[in-house]
Amino acid sequence: MEEARAYEELRVGFTAAVSHELRTPLARVLALLETAALPGADTAVLLDQAREQVEEMARLIDDILFLSQLESGREVAALGTTRALPVLEEIAGRLADSAERADVRIVVDAEPDVELPLRRRMLAIVAENLAENSIRYAGPGATLTLTARPSELVAADDGRGLEEDELPRLFERFYRSDRARASRGTGLGLAIVKHVVASAGGQVEASGGPGRGVRITCTFPAP
């Protein structure tokens, strides 16, 4: 009975959080469309901004569905192993433009033969979410290093860092630090990382502090 009650409270809380997260970009879309209908409005610019908000909602919905699949066990994270270096290099290349705009440098550190116990797609999802988090929040001039070692994947930046009491909350769904609230992002990236790693039998931990950057370590069982 207690377990059922706890599950229901979690479900209700998650539904409320999803509703809140969708309401904000939806309100922006409606405001932009109303403004676009006014005489003399720059319709092209306003419609482009509205499109960006719709794309943000689509990303949020995709993340919610993926997280739901992970939690229900319908999406399998661990199925064999994947060489880490090609995946990390691919992610670094894919995010090069956004990293350049944020003035964040990405470095990949992995030996060619290092493998991690995740399907390729899952390793890419983990690495991309870790990298995107640093790109958004580390601050200009920071360096993000993606490191793969046997049974370990680390994303460490030397950016602004966070208060130590915020670090354990990074993996909560929809959690954003005070500084991150104005930044774009679904608020689910690190929650997805945690669930993917956990479904492969691993653990995730964040460390760091103000002015010391953030280090996120994903540790997997030894083969």
Task: Locate predicted features.
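Conserved micro-motifs of the catalytic ATP-binding
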Residues: 72-77, 115-121
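Short helix-loop "hinge" at the ATP-lid/N-box region of the Bergerat-fold HATPase_c
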Residues: 134-135
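Conserved catalytic submotifs in the C-terminal HATPase_c
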Residues: 78-80, 100, 105-115
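Short conserved segment of the HATPase_c
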Residues: 162-174
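Conserved glycine-rich
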Residues: 140, 201-202
